[in-house]
Amino acid sequence: MKITLGVAVAALAIGGLHYYKNADSKVQNIEETEEVAKVNPVGPSFNADSAYAFTKAQCDFGPRDMNSRGHDLCGEWIVSKFMEYGCKVTTQTATLAGYDGTKLRSRNIMASINPEATTRILLCAHWDSRPWADNDPDSANWRKPILAANDAASGVAVMLELARIIRKSKDEKAFNKQLGIDFVCFDAEDWGTPQWADVADNADSWALGAQYWSKNLPQGYEARYGILLDMVGGVGAKFYREGMSMQYAPEIV
């Protein structure tokens, strides 16, 4: 995907979504090294195999590019899984215009845990797939849709796994009822201008669902902070402290 829109993004960490905080809550210059930080996760364990299975399940629908049957079926599956894990699910539908004027049937999926809680955390990812493999080394594939296991079935899979383990924590009465969590699956993210198009790339042609959501928030909605999960399933992936997050939420990062 092409990141063009910040939606309350704080930080992304590997696996269990661990957060780091300086003792004095001040920004420090950190030298990037190859060393992996050792942390002690708090709370239920994140199951990587389960997240992998959720990723595969999405890919089994085939490409999830806009207006396709695979896209529609996968959307229904995502809704059913969040409901299975006790989330209150709402959808936000709209007809959006692609870079070339194509009408896109967009569906943002919002799943909430403890919807009555006023202190809320936002986690988000996009669930549509890129309709063109315009970065493929083989130009013969440039106009073919991609399966998109990493970009971005992996992000939705992480959210589903978190919903699953939080549901287990709630069943065991170990979850803070004063805290609400919102999972938002953005649609129409990756219909941005392809490299082979005869028009200039327009940043606003990307992240259409996120743009629509940010302009049509539920009345009174406010999240304390948010985490964007994008392309988190790559082999040997490394995630660094992101600049915008360090600027706006250093105490969380």
Annotate each language-model stretch with its function.
Residues 34-39, 52-64, 142, 236-237:
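Acidic/histidine-rich, surface-exposed loop or edge segments in extracytoplasmic proteins
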Residues 143-251:
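Acidic/histidine-rich catalytic neighborhood of metal-dependent amide-processing enzymes
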Residues 65-66, 95-98, 115-117, 127-131, ...:
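Solvent-exposed loop/turn segments at secondary-structure junctions
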Residues 44-51, 64-75, 102-104, 148-156, ...:
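Solvent-exposed, acidic/flexible segments
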Residues 20-49:
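Sec-dependent signal peptide cleavage junction
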Residues 53-116:
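A non-catalytic alpha/beta surface segment that caps or lines the substrate-entry region
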Residues 4-16:
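Hydrophobic membrane-insertion alpha-helices, especially the h-region
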